[in-house]
Amino acid sequence: MANNIDVGFKVFKLDSTNIKPWDATVKYDETTLYDLQDYVVKEDRSNLDIAYEVMLKYGIFNMPLEEKEVNGKTVYSVGEGYMIISLNDEITTEDVAAIAALSPKAVVFKESGFVNDNAKMNADYTFKRLGIDNVKCI
């Protein structure tokens, strides 16, 4: 029976980043740059891998990570809502409002995840209006 107890201990192995390296020597036209924004994450990495890398970059590995559903989309809640990580596609203004209602201190989105530029700009405004200034896109 004692073998089934989860003590919350995680072991991580140091690996390379989940983000593809950028080749600054190549000249890209505007259309190619726009198309490349969807391919910044390495193919063999999961959203959970990316969530853990975000936690590492923020220095918050001692907080619990849980998967939640917000407005029908899966997000990662770090530290019981301290940070919300949304790596979804088609993020709408309604999705942003639902995340903002959780009152996180920090929010991370996928840069190309917003349904359009208007939704991204409204997200920035919504969080600033609520005093949530730590909003990033990867």
Can you annotate each of these PLM segments?
Residues 1-138:
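Accessory, often C-terminal, charged low-complexity segments
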